[in-house]
Amino acid sequence: MAYTETKNTSWGERLGGAFKGVATGLVLILLGSWLLWWNEGRTYKKAGAIGEAMVQTQDVADISTVDPALEGKVVHAMGRADTTDVLTDPAFGVSTTAIALSREVEYYQWTEHEKSETRKKLGGGEETVTTYTYSREWVASPIDSSAFHDPMYSTAQPLSRNDMGPNDTLADFEDEELYAQNVSFGAYKLPPFLVHRIGGAVPMALSPESVDLQAIAVAIHVSDLYARRYLEAPVSADALVHVAGSTIYIGQNPGTPKIGDVRVTFQRTPPADVSIIAKVMSDTFEEYVASNGYTFSRLAMGKASMEKMFEDAKSENSTMAWILRIVGIVVVVAGLRTVLSPLAVLVGVLPILESLVGAGIGLVSLLLGLAWSFVVIAVAWVRFRPLLS
């Protein structure tokens, strides 16, 4: 069932809001310009760090012993990332010997969706009709339903066996990721910044015997709201805990989730073959620091050649450069459009005229934004690459 709200805004209110938005538009232009400038410097310096590291990196075929001759050198090596550390989730008691153990928590909640339609009125005013709809979804964190617009979902108390009404949770946990402190790489030890990049996580195989059911039951809180909605008679907290596959489900029935139910999924990252590029420091590694201050290190899953790893690094740097360029241009164009928007509102007493002027402002903002962005990029290119330009 949808809930609607209608808001009428006068021409004067719209004009005042448009002029207030000019300052925001100027900030957006400055922000977008700074992003474009900074990105060109970042791209150039990152490329320099990659090139500097590439010249200095040497292949190491044997990592079965610590070689003092490699101290302080940048190396490329392939080997097994292994560990004997036992990781234990403090809240659920789940244990495994692995490089990483992750916990993902989801809550079954009412979520609010809105859709607005604005109609311009003769005289410059606007009428905005906003429709709010609600659906049950699994989300990453509890949703504060007191901010919902429909009172039936924000403040109203549900009738018996009716799950309309405020959100609720049976328990409150957060996502967490645990990492092994001792991960071997041949005779060397991988530092945390490389350990955290190891992928290949797989679902845990859980059973009621492998989790701390008592600790979970203590964390469960069956509110009056949940009981009134779903429970015909009081139940013990441990009766609401279900373990199957890689998931611990907190609720009555995993097959028919209710508002307030919680599900927690566990994954483990087993030992794996990896390839790294990093600077040797005693029996471990650190990031290579280039002469321009930028750092460089890489970890790839499986066996990857030095050439492939550097090509991937260059490709990622180039891709990020274009992503940030596009973002910067969009921000500049949006800022210009916001600065010029009062012109459209000024003629808004005639809706058709406002539409025409608005379309013109959009085109002008796009052209000016592109031109200004290209100027900023060109000047930044000359600033950071004087020899190339």
Predicted feature locations:
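N-terminal Lys/Arg-rich, disordered targeting/topogenic segments
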Residues: 1-13
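Domain-level marker for long, solvent-exposed, non-transmembrane regions
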Residues: 2-5, 38-41, 76-78
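Alpha-helical transmembrane segments forming the membrane-embedded cores
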Residues: 7, 320-324, 328, 335-389
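Cytosolic-side membrane-insertion boundary helix
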Residues: 11-18, 291-334, 358
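Hydrophobic alpha-helical transmembrane signal-anchor segments
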Residues: 13-42
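Alpha-helical transmembrane signal-anchor/signal-peptide segments
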Residues: 39-63
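Short extracytoplasmic
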Residues: 56-91
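Soluble non-transmembrane domains of integral membrane proteins
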Residues: 80-82, 86-283
